[in-house]
């Protein structure tokens, strides 16, 4: 009988660990306070109990947008002038930097190129490339007899 009570206890634990229903998963809603129907105030307006008022677009905004486009165009030209003005001295500094790097690259190329040239001249010092080709001279000439 002791084993049966343990089993029944396990069943209860399993049912408690089972996933809750969909309603329990939902986010708890705010408590809604019942407000009596809005009555007009002495000034004629209805009270606003913490509700956000919707801002309505006015046709004036559409006409003001065209004015803003003109302002944007003038701002763009001013920014371009400032951009070009700022870029002018930077280009000069870039030129000086490029010259320095070119000189460094030329020096590096000269030091690298000087070694292969010496090796190349020593390897083919006695060969003339017009008539003497070593790999063809080593091959036997076919005889058509």
From Swiss-Prot:
Subcellular location: Cytoplasm; Nucleus
Basic residues biased stretches: 89-102
Entry's Gene Ontology molecular function annotations: mRNA binding
Alphabetical UniProt keywords: Cytoplasm, mRNA processing, Nonsense-mediated mRNA decay, Nucleus, RNA-binding
One Pfam family matching this protein: PNRC
Main location: cytoplasm
Residue spans of biased composition, Basic and acidic residues class: 55-73
Record carries keyword RNA-binding: yes
Gene Ontology terms: cellular component: cytoplasm; nucleolus; nucleus
Sequence ranges of Polar residues compositional bias: 29-42
Annotated segments matching region Disordered: 1-74, 89-115
Gene Ontology biological-process entries: deadenylation-dependent decapping of nuclear-transcribed mRNA; mRNA processing; nuclear-transcribed mRNA catabolic process, nonsense-mediated decay; positive regulation of translation in response to stress
Family: Belongs to the EDC family.
Stated role: mRNA-binding protein which stimulates mRNA decapping by DCP1 and DCP2.
Further remark: Present with 538 molecules/cell in log phase SD medium.
Protein's recorded name: Enhancer of mRNA-decapping protein 2
